[in-house]
């Protein structure tokens, strides 16, 4: 039963944090596209790790990540207003590179396939 509840909390926070980043943050340095990929709330609901993927050039990725890190308290306050929890967890934003890693692996597999194709000819 608690796994079901924690899963619902994670998904609700993910949805609300995505909306906050997309609609409520007005910082001009937030130029890259940001996607919240996962939220992990601890069992005691004191902390929430928010994993984000940022698409864009390296400079804009770094700027966007710094804006998000400095906005953790703003995001926490907004989540507290929108999600009904006894205590609002402290937000910890972390970079999620799994999509980029997956694209890299896909590219390597494609190169291997091309090499095998040329070797067979």
Curated annotation (Swiss-Prot):
GO CC, alphabetical: cytosol
Is the Cytoplasm keyword given for this protein?
A: yes
**Care to name a GO molecular-function term for this sequence?**
ribosomal small subunit binding
Q: Which GO terms describe its biological process?
A: maturation of SSU-rRNA
Q: Which SUPFAM superfamilies match?
A: Ribosome-binding factor A, RbfA
Q: Where in the cell is it found?
A: Cytoplasm
- Top-rank taxon of the source lineage equals Bacteria
Q: Which keywords does this Swiss-Prot/TrEMBL entry list?
A: Cytoplasm, Ribosome biogenesis
Question: According to its UniProt record, what is one Pfam family this protein matches?
Answer: RBFA
Q: Which NCBIfam families match?
A: rbfA
Family the entry assigns: Belongs to the RbfA family.
Its quaternary organisation is: Monomer. Binds 30S ribosomal subunits, but not 50S ribosomal subunits or 70S ribosomes.
Q: What does this protein do?
A: One of several proteins that assist in the late maturation steps of the functional core of the 30S ribosomal subunit. Associates with free 30S ribosomal subunits (but not with 30S subunits that are part of 70S ribosomes or polysomes). Required for efficient processing of 16S rRNA. May interact with the 5'-terminal helix region of 16S rRNA.
Q: What is this protein called?
A: Ribosome-binding factor A
Report which gene this protein is encoded by. rbfA
């Amino acid at each position: 039963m608690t796994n079901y509840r924690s899963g619902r909390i994670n998904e609700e926070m993910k949805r609300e944090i995505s909306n906050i980043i997309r609609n409520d943050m007005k910082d001009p340095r937030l130029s890259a596209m940001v996607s919240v990929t996962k939220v992990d709330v601890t069992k005691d609901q004191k902390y929430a790790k928010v994993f984000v993927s940022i698409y864009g050039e390296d400079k804009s990725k770094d700027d966007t990540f710094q804006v998000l890190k400095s906005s953790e308290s703003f995001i926490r306050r907004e989540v507290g207003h929108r999600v009904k929890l006894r205590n609002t967890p402290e937000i910890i934003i972390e970079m999620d590179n799994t999509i980029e890693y997956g694209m890299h692996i896909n590219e390597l597999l494609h190169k291997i396939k091309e090499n095998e194709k040329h070797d067979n000819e």
